[in-house]
């Protein structure tokens, strides 16, 4: 059983067929089994919907369908961004003034630490700077 965190990069590449990473991400998706578990956050899903909001009706519809599906999928843990989690992310954001981490990245990193996750479906090298293993280098 794999335990994976899923970043905005992955969801967008999965949906957007013109994304240069689409083929690799789609192929990886085929390897996810019923025993695997994945985590993402409300903040990540907000980024996905925001990024695809002006990409046309079809893609917007697919993005909403993806989010709706993730929210009910028993393999997927969509972590709610509570005030406490927001403040944890903000604390990391504040502690790394020399980095270019987004607040969403900081929230994701805090969730990964809390859940003991080490692998993330992203190409964002910021995660390697915090000791995580990105699966799309």
Short names for language-model regions:
Residues 1, 109-137:
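Acidic, PIN/NYN-like endoribonuclease modules and their adjacent C-terminal/linker elements
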Residues 1-40, 55-68:
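Short, well-structured N-terminal submotif of metal-dependent ribonuclease cores
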Residues 6, 39-40, 80, 103, ...:
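Short beta-strand scaffold positions
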Residues 9, 49-50, 90:
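Amphipathic alpha-helical segments within well-ordered protein domains
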Residues 34-35, 73-74, 130:
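Structured helix-beta-strand junction loops
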Residues 50-54, 113:
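Short glycine/serine- and small hydrophobic-enriched flexible loop segments
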Residues 76-119:
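Active-site neighborhoods of divalent-metal-dependent phosphate/nucleic-acid chemistry enzymes
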